[in-house]
Amino acid sequence: MAVNDCFSLTYPHNPHPGDLIEVFRPCYQHWALYLGDGYVINIAPIDGIRSSFTSAKSVFSTKALVKMQLLKDVVGNDTYRINNKYDTTYPPLPVEEVIQRSEFPIGQEVAYDLLVNNCEHFVTLLRYGEGVSEQANRAIGTIGLVAAGIDIFTFLGLFPKRQRTKY
């Protein structure tokens, strides 16, 4: 999607129930699912770290709370777009089913993991019946590249080896 597909609440496009909402935070994207009448469902980490450290909070959290909130409150001063990017890969479930599936977990605590069970996994599971996260896959790929790079540097002897001291 083009950059001009992003918009803020000052230039609202009308999402439809069941749409995925991608919110652009300073260091990551947060995801929610539009329910209608201005409300979304999303998950937020709850592990006792101050909310001003939201991105750091999501890295260290193992639990999240399922919330139904106004879209404008979730977005705040950030920008967002409607992004049903997986529709060509996974057929969306009927809207009525998506909304029904969304109502059950509201207010519940759920397991959270930045790489395998994050906010994007949560909303795509509701929309498609399949939890997927391109953002998490990129992070996993980056971690793999860094680990492989360290292995190569170590193998080639580019990192200094510790000298054993003889006594």
Swiss-Prot record:
GO cellular component, one term: endoplasmic reticulum
Topological domain ranges for the Lumenal compartment: 160-167
Signal peptide: none
UniProt keyword annotations, A-Z: Cytoplasm, Hydrolase, Lipid degradation, Lipid metabolism, Membrane, Nucleus, Transferase, Transmembrane, Transmembrane helix
All ranges on the Cytoplasmic side of the membrane: 1-138
Record-annotated LRAT domain positions: 20-135
Ranges in coiled-coil conformation: none
GO BP terms in the entry: ether lipid metabolic process; lens fiber cell differentiation; lipid catabolic process; organelle disassembly; peroxisome organization; phosphatidylcholine metabolic process; Ras protein signal transduction; regulation of cell growth
Reaction catalysed by this enzyme: a 1,2-diacyl-sn-glycero-3-phosphocholine + H2O = a 1-acyl-sn-glycero-3-phosphocholine + a fatty acid + H(+); a 1,2-diacyl-sn-glycero-3-phosphocholine + H2O = a 2-acyl-sn-glycero-3-phosphocholine + a fatty acid + H(+); 1,2-dihexadecanoyl-sn-glycero-3-phosphocholine + H2O = 2-hexadecanoyl-sn-glycero-3-phosphocholine + hexadecanoate + H(+); 1,2-dihexadecanoyl-sn-glycero-3-phosphocholine + H2O = 1-hexadecanoyl-sn-glycero-3-phosphocholine + hexadecanoate + H(+)
Keyword Cell membrane applies: no
EC number, as in UniProt: 2.3.1.-, 3.1.1.32, 3.1.1.4
Family per similarity comment: Belongs to the H-rev107 family.
PANTHER family: HRAS-LIKE SUPPRESSOR - RELATED, PHOSPHOLIPASE A AND ACYLTRANSFERASE 1
Name of the protein in question: Phospholipase A and acyltransferase 1
Organism of provenance: Mus musculus (Mouse)
